[in-house]
């Protein structure tokens, strides 16, 4: 079970509060997004602008990591459609990747790179802190993954490689060999096209690649995907899906 941007349904996404919440809800791994601040420091942020999640505005790349740390990263979070904003003033700032790696020294990560320029600074930091063996690096951008493959750091298949497998599986062809550890795929592409079909997952598994699906918040959908052979769910609500997983796969004690 992978917490999407932490537990983004319970706390402001990509903050320490959300990551803590995910661990508290039972997530076995954490997913988050990384960009570079103006001073070249890798920070957790999904969008190119800070406007959607903080009390500031403008590009992430034009603010230093200190400025981002001083922002209110919980300012925009609302669990009830903007009826309330319970995390204003208490969600903390935008964390650096270093903070996260040091805060969770044993937790597996699915780290999504949002830009090519962030690749090398992130790679160096993973190696410096000894986190390369517990981190899978994902990106839509094939070029962003190259430094990690060259350094034997696990990666997830890029968007292009996902598309290739989807087409091949539709034609009944086997999955190609890829330099990646897993397929981390959207449940739907542009809200229309189902990616983790039965054929897709079967082809990936036959070739030895587990499939993780994002973002799955509905327990019934998660159960369906598990039934197809998907390995992991990337979710905003880890506790909700863990309850469903325990129902679908009860332990002997249960």
How should each PLM-predicted stretch be described?
Residues 1-3, 30-32, 109-111, 135-138, ...:
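Hydrophobic faces of well-ordered beta-strands that scaffold small-molecule active sites
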Residues 1-10, 197-202:
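N-terminal small/glycine-rich loop or linker at the start of catalytic domains
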Residues 6, 35-39, 47-48, 114-116, ...:
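Active-site beta-loop-alpha junctions enriched in small/polar residues
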Residues 18-36, 178:
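Catalytic domains of carbohydrate-active enzymes, especially glycoside hydrolases
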Residues 46-152, 178-207:
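Metal-dependent phosphodiesterase/phospholipase catalytic core, i.e.
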Residues 87-89, 159-160, 166-254:
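C-terminal active-site rim and adjoining tail of enzyme catalytic domains
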């Amino acid at each position: 079970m992978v917490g999407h941007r932490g537990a983004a349904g319970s706390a402001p996404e990509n903050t320490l509060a959300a990551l803590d919440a995910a661990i508290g809800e039972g997530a076995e791994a954490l997913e988050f997004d990384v960009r570079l601040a103006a001073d070249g420091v890798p920070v957790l942020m999904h969008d190119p602008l800070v406007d959607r999640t903080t009390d500031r505005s403008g590009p992430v790349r034009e603010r230093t990591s200190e400025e981002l740390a001083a922002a209110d990263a919980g300012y925009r979070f609302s669990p009830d459609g903007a009826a309330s904003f319970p995390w204003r003033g208490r969600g903390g700032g935008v964390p650096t990747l270093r903070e996260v790696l040091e805060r969770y020294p044993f937790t597996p990560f699915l780290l999504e790179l949002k830009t090519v320029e962030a690749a090398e600074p992130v790679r160096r930091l993973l190696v410096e802190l000894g986190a390369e063996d517990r981190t899978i690096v994902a990106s839509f951008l094939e070029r962003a993954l190259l430094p990690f493959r060259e350094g034997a750091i696990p990666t997830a298949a890029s968007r292009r490689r996902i598309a290739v497998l989807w087409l091949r599986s539709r034609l009944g062809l086997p999955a190609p060999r890829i330099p990646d550890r897993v397929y981390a795929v959207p449940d739907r592409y542009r809200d229309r096209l189902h990616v983790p079909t039965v054929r897709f997952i079967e082809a990936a598994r036959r070739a030895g690649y587990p499939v993780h699906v994002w973002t799955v918040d509905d327990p019934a959908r998660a159960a369906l995907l598990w039934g197809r052979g998907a390995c992991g769910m990337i979710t905003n609500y880890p506790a909700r899906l863990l309850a469903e997983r325990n129902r679908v796969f009860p332990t002997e004690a249960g």
